[in-house]
Amino acid sequence: MDMYAVKKTIFTFILILILPLKSFSKEIPGSFADLAERLMPSVVNISTTQTVVTRSNPFPGFQFPPGSPFEDMFKEFGTPQERQTSALGSGFIIDAKGIVVTNNHVIQDAEDIIVRVDGDKEFKAKVIGSDPLSDIAVLQLETKEKFTPVKFGDSDKARIGDWVIAIGNPFGLGGTVTSGIISARNRSIGLSRYEDYIQTDASINSGNSGGPLFDMNGDVIGINTAILGRNGSIGIGFSIPSNSAKIVIDQLIKFGETKRGWLGV
């Protein structure tokens, strides 16, 4: 074999090795910066306040045994005490008129809802409708200002291993972007009657509830709802698939509630 043939063989062998690597590298995003910059104005931070009523022990210094029926009986004789509590969450704008989607547990029993848009603009919001069973709520910002909405993607087309990004308000820090992949589909974790979660390893923490899970097209394919454990550091988060969420959201906007069919005698 002459030298030209040897060089040609080596070149062909190297080319065969490189081509699959180059093809695979196209699947890995070099940066999420452009996508995050486009989507962040549509993701909101939500803070709520509510009044909680507790009653003091009518017999200071005395503790009923665990499970004692007298504890509930005498609790009514205690002095009622009110205190203000607050909660944080996330959401995303789906209509230029200021319609926001979030989790029901973020706004449940809230007396005041404040939504922060694009980092510094704050608006009061009212609940259009909420559904505890699916843990979805829809809000209306009380303003005539126009906003940049995001759109829903087809969660049925999302595949295990696909890249995703989550944007939210972890620990009240404001717009925070994390990335990961879809780790599993059709997960049930015992939170509610209707469960079909997308599992992701994108970091989700307290305050991310109600925020969007985006695919690489910038479409919402999930609503971040739960984490496994007390914090999000273990890399297991769960999102309501967009196709399921859209059915509930459309009904909440139209009727203020969900209308489910029931079978019975």
Predicted features along the sequence, with ranges:
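A general, composition-driven signal for non-globular sequence regions
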Residues: 1-2, 16
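Bacterial N-terminal signal peptides that target proteins for export
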Residues: 2-11
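General helical structural elements
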Residues: 11-12, 79
